From Swiss-Prot:
Transmembrane segments: none annotated. Residues 41-87, 104-135, 631-654, 854-888 are annotated as: Disordered. GO terms for molecular function: GTPase activator activity. This is Rab GTPase-activating protein eat-17. The lineage of its organism: Eukaryota, Metazoa, Ecdysozoa, Nematoda, Chromadorea. Residues 114-123, 874-888 have a biased composition (Polar residues). It comes from the Eukaryota.
Length: 888
């Protein structure tokens, strides 16, 4: 892209409808002789001085001034070209171009966004007006503009020849009118091909449009250009939206809006978009604005390490206060100080950023912290936050040169920065791995907890089932025992009833025999009434006995049925094999009971052994109380017997010694052995106490072994439960897989049915559409027929009125009757056609009976109207005249 000659004295932000066409129109103008052109212009405007308005200086005159003052910049020997001819004529095209340049200069002065505007001057120009005299300021501006004008004209050559010189010039500050072209050239946006894509991006939609619209009012709210309703907000939205479409990975970040706004204050939106793309791709801003913001964390880490190296006391103060680097420096890197510094300082920072890149942001950050170190050491966290938000801006608003001077003195070690980058990446990788491992462990822990809860619930359910089963069995056994007791009672009652019945029968027989004997012996008659009463009472007793017998038989029968049912149920329970879980639990219960029985038996034996020992000890004590010698002998014998039991092969000498002691005690021995009797008894007592303690310890040992067996049994039971639960889980998983397969099959069937339904609906819709088309065609035909009928009726009425007025002859009437006949035949034909059409409409699926009825009624009324007219046509002229008069 060829630099435009209009950068000298042109507005910093061109109107959008003038910028593109004007640059294309004047692109070939750089090949002309600038000094010759300016000489002709100065001759034509001799009354105006070129020093009066710095905005109207031409690049050739600025280049000549730069050659005179080359000692100030140290490069005069390399900037001059061939001498220019000042007396050469100027063409009309060049004069037109100069006129356009003057017009644009005037529009620049009237533009509120331009730094050269008469309405809103920049803070730099106001400050310079206060510090310098107008002549010095004008001379300085003319000198600086001349250098930059020559530099912009020969940009491609100067960049290759003197890059360090350009870098120094940029650090001193780019003039406001040259920033648009200088930023494009420094960022290589002038040769980029993204200008052509901007219009395509504007026609596309972005997913970030709502977020962008929300954040636009927050961007530079103090500037009039970006207030509500102004053109700046629409331009800002367009550029940010275009970049979100251009780079879908980055999309939109709020910090980019301030950089775009800074660019829009200097150039049109297409050029701002090109510079933004270049900044994103070539100056690490794209990595800053990615959703992960990895590069932002790296910058924070590097800045923190730099502060630790250069200002350890401030670093310690920040750590003690819990003041993280991202709390004050994240906006510096995301917005390039556009939200922290005034606009003119932000422009100068952007100038140096385009030359040095992200390293200059580090330098500015270190410079701010160095100058504010003493004040920050006195503040707490809230004070430091307020300081970075307000006081930093106020401090450098009128003293920007100090900030840039200190920043230029800051030296960054490239190797140190690379090493910090490697350390940060290593640390981040380690943190990510630890986070992944932590998430995995948490997931495992959650799954294990779920499995433990599930197993505990299942084990509790199984235990409940086992307890319920045992309770049911106990209840059934108790019911069985109760029923057996009831059966025995009923049997006893039945036997008693049978005995009573037999006794009653025997009593009856005895009474009857006694009666016969009395009758035969005495011959006396018994009172009939008493006999009858006695018989009745006996009969009543007999009936009651029969009733009791029947009740007892019924009760016995019910008891037998209940017993048979219980026996069948018990037999069925014994024959049916229990389930695997119940069988396992029964086996485990049996093994536990067996172990418990063994342990209890061992415990009983141990207690019995202990009781025997205590009894033996009591006996020994009793005997010794009455006969010490015999007690000692018995004790020795018992001790020897125990020792022989515990030690099957004792030494021979000890056995002989004990035998000698026993014999000596029996025959009276020597006096020395009798003297030692007391000590022997004490030893025997101690030995017996030790044996009793040994028995106690053995008992405790067996109890501990019993507890160990119980714990092993519990462990075995838990292991079996876990195995069964794992098998149950496998079975449930298999069932779930089968259900998933069935679900997939059903879903496939559902999809097929939906497709069939869609096909049927499409066929039905096609049929409805065809029927509607047929119906519309039929209605159109009916309308055509009705219109033809109405036309024929009109013709008929016209002819009839003409004949009535003329008083036509009978021949005419005959002809007319013939014509009426033809009309009637046509009408009949039309009625036939309408009948066919009605039949067609009746066969259609779309039924509208009202229209068919109207058509039939219309045809009927038409035929009824035609018939009296035909009759009237057959009358003579007198009748027609009478009718005419009547009608009139």
């Amino acid at each position: 892209m060829v630099p435009s000659p209009a950068l000298v004295g042109t507005p910093s932000v061109f109107p959008h409808h003038q910028s593109t066409s004007f640059f294309q129109e004047t692109a070939s103008f750089f090949n002309l002789d600038w000094e010759r052109l300016w000489h002709s212009r100065s001759n034509s405007n001799s009354t105006s001085s070129p020093r009066n308005s710095p905005s109207q200086l031409s690049p050739p005159m600025a280049a000549t001034a730069a050659l005179r003052r080359s000692s100030d910049y140290g490069s005069a020997d390399t900037e001059c070209g061939e001498p220019c001819e000042t007396g050469a004529p100027v063409s009309l095209n060049e004069v037109d171009l100069l006129a356009k340049m003057e017009q644009l200069n005037k529009s620049n002065e009237e533009d509120s966004r331009s730094v050269a505007s008469k309405k809103t001057g920049s803070s730099e120009s106001r400050k310079g007006a206060r510090e310098h005299s107008p002549e010095e300021d004008e001379y300085f501006q003319e000198d600086l503009w001349s250098v930059w004008g020559e530099l912009i004209l020969n940009w491609e050559i100067e960049v290759k020849k003197r890059p360090n010189y350009i870098k120094d010039l940029v650090k001193r500050g780019i003039p406001q009118h040259f920033r648009m072209i200088a930023w494009q050239n420094l960022s290589n946006a002038s040769v980029s091909s993204v200008h052509d894509l901007y219009s395509d991006y504007m026609r596309q939609s972005s997913v970030y449009e709502k977020v962008i619209q929300r954040d636009i009012p927050r961007t530079y709210p103090e500037l009039d250009f970006f207030k509500d309703g102004e053109r700046g907000q629409s331009l800002l939205f367009n550029v940010i939206k275009a970049y979100s479409v251009h780079d879908k990975e980055v999309g939109y970040c709020q910090g980019s809006a301030f950089i775009v706004g800074l660019l829009l204050l200097q150039m049109p939106e297409e050029e701002a978009f090109a510079v933004l793309v270049s900044l994103m791709e070539n100056y690490r801003l794209r990595e800053l604005y990615k959703p992960t913001m990895t590069d932002l964390g790296l910058c924070m880490f590097q800045l923190e390490c730099l502060v630790q190296d250069q200002m350890p006391d401030l670093y310690t103060h920040f750590n003690n206060m819990g003041f993280d680097t991202s709390m004050y420096a994240s906006s510096w890197f995301l917005t390039l100080f556009t939200t922290t510094m005034p606009l003119d300082i932000a422009n100068r920072i952007m100038d140096c950023f385009l030359v040095e890149g992200m390293d200059f942001i580090f330098c500015i950050s270190i410079a701010i912290l160095q100058q504010a170190r003493i004040e920050l050491l006195r503040l707490d966290m809230e004070g430091m936050l307020k300081y970075f938000q307000r006081e930093v801006r106020e401090r450098y608003e009128f003293d920007a040169d100090l900030l840039f001077t200190v920043a230029n003195q800051v030296q960054l070690n490239a190797k140190r920065m690379k090493r910090l980058e490697k350390d940060y990446l290593t640390k981040r990788t380690k943190e990510q791995e630890e986070a992944v491992e932590l998430r995995r462990l948490r997931t495992e822990n959650r799954l294990l907890r779920q499995r433990i809860d599930y197993l505990e619930a299942e084990s509790s359910a199984l235990a409940d089932r086992l307890v319920k089963g045992q309770v049911n069995l106990a209840q059934e056994a108790e019911n069985y025992i109760n029923i057996a007791h009831e059966l025995n009672k009923l049997r006893d009652m039945n036997s008693d009833v049978h005995r009573k019945l037999e006794g009653a029968y025997e009593t009856i027989r005895e009474l009857s025999s006694a009666r016969r004997d009395n009758i035969m012996d005495t011959g006396t008659q018994v009172d009939d009434t008493s006999m009858i009463e006695h018989i009745h009472s006996l009969q009543q007793e007999l009936i009651e006995a029969h009733t009791r017998q029947a009740d007892s038989e019924n009760t016995l029968r019910d008891a037998k049925l209940r017993v048979s049912e219980l026996e069948m149920a018990n037999k069925r329970l014994l024959e049916n094999e229990p389930s695997e879980d119940v069988a396992g639990l029964q086996e485990e219960l049996i093994s536990v009971k067996m172990r418990e029985a063994e342990s209890s038996l061992a415990l009983k034996e141990m207690r019995q052994r202990l009781a025997e020992l205590e009894q033996h000890w009591a006996k020994y004590v009793h005997v010794r109380a009455f006969d010490p010698s015999s007690a000692s002998i018995e004790k020795e014998s018992t001790s020897e017997a125990h020792s022989t039991q515990q030690q099957p092969s004792p030494p021979l000498t000890s056995a002989r010694a004990r035998l000698a002691k026993i014999t000596a005690s029996l025959i009276g021995g020597s006096t020395e052995e009798t003297d030692n009797c007391i000590s022997v008894r004490e030893l025997e007592d101690q030995l017996m106490g030790v044996r009793i303690k040994e028995a106690d310890t053995l008992a405790e040992l067996k109890e501990m072994r019993q507890k160990v067996m119980e714990l092993e049994t519990q462990n075995h039971v838990c292991t079996n439960q876990l195995k069964r639960q794992d098998e149950e889980m496998k079975r449930v998983r298999e069932d779930s897989e089968v259900l998933v397969k069935k679900r997939k099959e059903l879903e496939d069937q559902l999809k097929d049915e939906k497709e069939k339904l869609d096909n049927k609906e499409s066929e039905f819709n096609e049929g409805r559409i065809n029927d509607r088309l047929k119906y519309s065609e039929a209605m159109q035909t009916i309308q055509d027929l009705q219109s033809s009928i109405s036309q024929l009726e009109l013709k008929k009425a016209e002819k009839w009125t003409q004949n009535q007025l003329r008083g036509s002859s009978v021949c005419d009437l005959d002809e007319e009757s013939n014509s009426h006949g033809s009309i009637c035949s046509n009408v009949d034909h039309l009625s036939l056609a309408s009948d066919e059409m009605n039949a067609l409409l009746a066969d259609m699926t779309v039924r509208i009976p009202t229209l068919d009825d109207l058509a039939e009624e219309g045809s009927a009324t038409e035929t009824d109207e035609l018939r009296p007219k035909e009759l009237n046509d057959g009358n003579d002229t007198t009748d027609s005249g009478v009718q005419l008069s009547d009608s009139h």
